[in-house]
Amino acid sequence: MKPRILLLIATSGLALAQPDEPISDAPAPEPRELAPQDRPDAERLETPPANVSGAVLARLNAEFLTDDEQADLRVQHGQWTDEDLADPVRLANSLAIAHAWAHPALTEENAASAEQAKLSRAEAALNRGEAENAIDFTAESGLVRAHQIRGRAHELLGDTESAIAAYERASSFDAETPDEPEAVRAALALFRLRAPDNAEQANRALLERITRARDADRLNYNARLVEAELLYARHNLADAQAAAREALRLNPRAAGAWRLIGDIAVDSFDFDTAESIADQLDQLASTAREASVLAKAVSADAAALRARAALRRRDPDGAETALNPALGAYPDRHELRALDAAASAASYRVTSTERLLAEFDERSPGLPDALVWVGRTLAEARQYDLADGYLLRAIERAPNWSMPRLERGLMLVQAGRDRDARSELEQALALDPFDIRAQNSLKLVTELATYETIETEHFVVRYLDGIDAALAPEMAVALEAMHDRVCSDLPGGVDFEPATRTIIELMPNHEWFAVRIGGMPSIHTMAASTGPVIAIESPQEGPKFTVGPFDWKRVLQHEYTHTVNLARTRNRVIHWMTEANAVFNEDAPRDMRTWTLLANAYQNDGLFDLQEINTAFVRPEKPSDRALAYNQGAWMFAYIVERWGPEMPRTIMDLSAAGRSATEAFEQALGDTPESFLASFKPWARSQLTEQGLLLPEGTPSVPDLLAEALQALGADQDPDQIQDPGALPPEGLIDELLERFPDHAPLLEYKIAFALVNAEVRLTDEQLGLLVRMTELRPPDDAPHRRLARHYLAGDDFDERLRAIPHLEFLDAREINSPAYAAELAELYAKSDRPQRAQAKAERASSIAPFSATLREQAARYALLAGDLDAAERHLVALIIIEPDRPIHQRRLDALIRGQAG
């Protein structure tokens, strides 16, 4: 019944005419999370279908093929049967395709000894980290695949000279060989180990070889896969994914293609798809295993994917949990050991990290991979100085590999060291001119060098000269007020000042904002703090912008709280608390959607304790978990401030910065365990929900209980056929009777309002008005009655009647993030009621949310003049000249204002 009533309420009104944008009494659209620090909205990938292409099926069913030829082709295209795998060579090859590296057929001494089978065993040994065995298995083979495997084995052993020699032999084979994809892999590997005389020419030659390999056999999945690997190495994620999908259409069991798409999913923050692909890789790792040992199959690829995803979510414990079983099965696999070191670094265990790096070096001396992973992970955790040290060590080890230089360049961009970043990115591109991420980032820092700057005491605002010049000066002024608020010792204040000016970069469109934050134009939020730098997308309308106008002051105050918190704690802060602090410092009332989310969690025993809330951020079990963690965190922050005082959150975060876990910090500061904190929080939470009308007072029966009682009484007096269907709307008369008994029962009042507003006119009756006003008293955060009341009063013929909309518009405006409509209407009402200062304040807010609206700028200038604020009027006229340079009226008005001031 409840959804039906809400639908009646939601659809009971029409929009109000407003300048620029209408006010609606329909429910507000769900607001975008202001600053998802660790997971910008994911670029969702579709899990590839596991069916083979029609062309492959036609090849497999060709009548001229012998049985053995058909069986070989079935293995080549991932369509093998149990009967096919009775042959030891086909079994070995199928296991290599599926990356089932630990299968007995690839590990036991008496396994198949045919050349191709031995090469599959060599590849398996290589992927288990057994480089010497891989070399032994390939000793008698002169095939391209053998040379390529030997090259990587020597690389893992730290024998760069032998690795180069093996890769050269593999890549020198004629392009007509069926093993051309392996030759391309070898040529690609050479880029890591030595600098070509002409990098651009060498890259083009590599692309030509891939094209030839693809053209030589259109159904060779390996040709598509190596193409995907090259594109992925160049950070061309879209084309890499397309090529990997093509490979899967030619061989649905190609674990290498699945793994690559999984890596792209992690890079795109699409952790659901990454997990789905990890499950697929787990299944492939069980290829040809007996049912009794299926549970023992461990996929190294799946473990690496899950660990990578956990590290991106800043969940080092989750990464280690994912890695441990795989490290048990593959203790020498270099990738797993590198990720293990990265997970240790993400937990700030310096001694452990160095030990793991030393163990990695014992197995693979001179290999830079672990250093790159550690540096990259620390950079994402905003530990820029530590990251720099590891990445410099990686560059020293692999001066010809572009990856460490690229990662360092990207880290320097995030740290705001643009000059150093530019130098590093230029060197990365000299080694690999086709890397898209490096190209994007270098283009960014080159463009940033041309930006205009405004310096204040605590900030440097950078912006592209043009239309953003209308906003940047206002932003600079507002930021200093934010500094005073955020750095204060007031509730929510961090009581700390960063040592250097914070750089605010006003990015001219979403694409450049995304490149600024992540090096690729595929991040879906509008502001983010990297610590010393806050990037924010210009709040403009159009296809190049994600959200259009938004309350950038609120957003920046949120982000600056992150920046100051990170500075105070040296970037070591309890995840949920820094988010909670940032939301608290938005200084905006909690809206109805948030209250409803919290109430549902409370009623369903779904509130998180201190351990669960961090897990909900990094490993959400339900789609709503992260939103709940975000909002419950801010709620708990308010509770801590109210109960222990404004200093307590800072004490807890300082303990975290000193190395305490979240649980330890709370126990030391508050004397609370996760369980006892939640136990003490819940009564406070209930009192808040009751106060806000989201929960009924203790002892008050719910609507279902009241209706059940009424229906039971009805059934005692009437025939069963006359008893109303419990799923139908109750009679209005029954609701009236119940409201007489329980006049403060907000859910009952919802029913009454729904009945009263069916077919209601824009102008309401006194009875309808009384019901809506009563709802504002019983359920203070509910925006629906305020929307309906505002529409009613604004439709009045009498001006004094229209003025009665003001408190309802103020309520709505205080909770609005994206629309200037409420503030603009309030400005008009205040101006016409001779309250010029209030009119100016609301016109300023409207023009702040939509700073490029000429209509709102004109309104703001007009009311600034009305309030006698000539400086503000001049500022808006200057902005109008920038926004509408083809309208000379703005310049004439500005000239007149200046003359008037001079006179």
Regions found by a protein language model. Name each.
Residues 20-75, 79-100, 123, 277-280, ...:
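Beta/coil-rich, acidic/histidine-enriched accessory regions frequently appended to metallopeptidases
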Residues 40-41, 45-81, 96-103, 194, ...:
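Zn2+-dependent metallopeptidase catalytic core
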Residues 99, 129, 158, 198-201, ...:
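Residue-level detector of the short coil/turn that links helix A to helix B
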Residues 112, 141, 175, 218, ...:
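Short coil turns that delineate tetratricopeptide repeat
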Residues 116-123, 145-152, 180-189, 222-226, ...:
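Alpha-solenoid helical repeat scaffolds
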Residues 134, 163, 202, 206, ...:
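Single-residue signature of alpha-solenoid repeat helices
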Residues 204, 208-212, 242-243, 284, ...:
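Juxtacatalytic substrate-recognition/specificity segment
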Residues 351-355, 414, 419-422, 573, ...:
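Amphipathic alpha-helical substructures
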